[in-house]
Structures are given as C-alpha cells and as structure tokens.
C-alpha cells in the first residue's frame, strides 16, 4: 500500500481521537456526572409501606392522592378512587427516576430554558404521618427525550434525571375510567322505562319485547360504549331533589352482566348517574369475578356525565 496514504490515514486517526477526546472533555465539564444513578425518590421507595399522600402540582391544577384502605383516592374529586393505570405509571416513575447528571446552579434564564419555572410539575410525597419524604420540581425533557431537567428540594443544583413523567394534567384524568364501556355487539337487551328491546343473538335485530317493531336504539348503544365521569359525589353529598325524576335504563349483556343506570338531569345540561351491577341467572365466571372485584367502585357513588352522553341517556326511549 502507498505509504502516503498510510501517513494520511494515521493523521486522520490522530485528529479523530483528538476531537473525540475534546468532545468527551467538554461534556464532562458542561454536564459532569454525579451520584452514580442515585434514586431521586429514595425516601419514597424506602417507605412504600408507610406512604400517606402524593401531591402532583401542575400548571393547571393541584392533585392530592390520599391512601385509604390500601387504595389511592383523588381528594379533589369526592375522594373517589384513582385509576390503577395512572398510579402504576406514577410508581414506575418513582422507581425509574435516577440522577444522571448534575448541571450546577441555574440562573433565572436557565430555569425558564429548562422548564423549571411556572410550567414545571412538582411532586411531593408524604408518609402516613404527613412528613415530606421527597419534593422534586420536574421541568422539560432534554433534547434526546431520555432525561428531564429537575430540581430536588434541599439541592441548589439542576439535575438531569431519568423517568417518563407524563402526568395527567387535570384531577379528572386521575380517576378510574371509564365508568362503563360496553360494545354494542355484547348487548343482548336494553330496557328503558317499561319497554325492552331484546335480541336472542348478535346477528338478529333488536325487537321490542312482545311486539314485532324493530326499534332504533343505535345511539343509546353507542353512548354506552364509553361512559366517563367528570365529577364524583358520595351518596350523602348528592341531593337528588335538585334534579328531575331519573331515567332508568337496564342493560343486559350476552355473558350475563346486568347494569342498571339511573340518570338524573337538570337545567344547564347537567347530568349525573348512578350505576348498579348484578347478573342474570347464569352469568359467566368472568362476570361474577368482575362484580366481586369492582362493585365498590359504584356502590353509593354518583357520577357527573359528559353533556352529550348524559343528554342521550336521559332522553332515551324505545318505540
């Protein structure tokens, strides 16, 4: 091989090594590593059996999650139950959050740049006695989306930390949702008032019980496909006298689930509902298990519905 090319290749190699070394040095100076991956929520992880409250402060709202009877509840919304998925994601964030780099103290301009100003999320964890375990201000994601800028209470420096931190930004988004989600294909009968639309099989159209008429109930079935809560009250805090007489709907599925919905309405497009679950004489094992594990989510609770869903169900009729 020509020695000239070997010399050129050698020079290029030296240059490459030099610039690579300079790049690593600059990174180490600008963002020196620190703590070796120490957990951000160390005290929280050490007190998992003694947690009491989690506070999530967002630019839009403050949400307090209180642990009662081993279940997390959203204090701002009737003390109703928080969603399993949301809580699981939150605790995964606690477990995954580790210090990656220390960036040093930040100026006011840096705080805005890193999202550690009014746009930040603040997470506070407390034990059962109310003592603060961890308080962390979480800002923007870094350019690679692998880390977030953060400030840890008691520290002046800004850190890069690992973790997802895609928190729900409203209290309602923390609730166990949806209240009800029934596919139209699963519904065997729908009773509204004194009339019942029923079918023996999915391929057969609905008929009004005792008649040959084919009712149009598709909009009711579609509304039952996703029923969500936008506010929640305990039975003792819900004044039924403030509403018109409720509309009663009973839905029965092919696998034996029976859902009775009482829908309350009043002026201003405000609709609330209560839900009760039972079974037919021969339900499937899955239905029995569902009722046993989920009945507490509905017993003595009233739920505010979205106006469009509430309007459809409150004005439902079969003819």
PLM feature spans:
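Secondary-structure "cap/kink" motif recognition
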Residues: 1-319
């Amino acid at each position: 091989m020509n020695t000239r090319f070997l010399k050129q290749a050698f020079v290029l190699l030296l240059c490459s090594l030099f610039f690579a070394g300079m790049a690593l040095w600059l990174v180490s100076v600008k963002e020196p590593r620190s703590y070796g991956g120490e957990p951000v929520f160390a005290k929280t992880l050490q007190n998992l059996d003694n947690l009491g409250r989690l506070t999530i402060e967002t630019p839009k709202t403050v949400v307090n999650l209180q642990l009662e009877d081993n279940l997390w509840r959203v204090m701002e919304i009737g003390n109703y139950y928080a969603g399993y998925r949301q809580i699981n994601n939150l605790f995964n964030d606690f477990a995954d959050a580790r210090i990656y780099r220390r960036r040093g103290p930040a100026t006011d301009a840096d705080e805005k740049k890193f999202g550690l100003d009014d746009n930040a999320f603040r997470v506070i964890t407390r034990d059962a006695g109310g003592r603060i375990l961890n308080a962390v201000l979480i800002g923007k994601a870094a350019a690679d989306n692998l880390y977030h800028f953060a400030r840890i209470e008691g520290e002046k420096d800004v850190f890069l930390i690992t973790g997802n931190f895609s928190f729900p930004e409203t209290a309602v988004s923390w609730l166990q949702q949806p209240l009800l989600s029934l596919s139209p294909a699963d519904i065997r009968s729908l009773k509204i008032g004194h009339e019942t639309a029923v079918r023996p099989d999915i391929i057969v159209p609905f008929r009004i019980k005792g008649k040959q008429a084919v009712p149009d109930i598709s909009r009711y079935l579609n509304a039952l496909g996703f029923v969500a809560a936008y506010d929640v009250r305990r039975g003792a805090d819900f004044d039924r006298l403030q509403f018109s007489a409720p509309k009663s709907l009973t839905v029965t599925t092919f696998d034996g689930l029976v859902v009775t919905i009482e829908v309350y309405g009043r002026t201003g497009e405000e609709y609330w509902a209560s839900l009760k679950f039972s079974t037919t004489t021969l339900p499937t094992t899955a239905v029995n298990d569902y009722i046993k594990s989920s009945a507490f989510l509905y017993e003595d609770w009233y739920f505010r519905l979205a106006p469009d869903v509430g309007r459809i169900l409150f004005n439902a009729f079969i003819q």
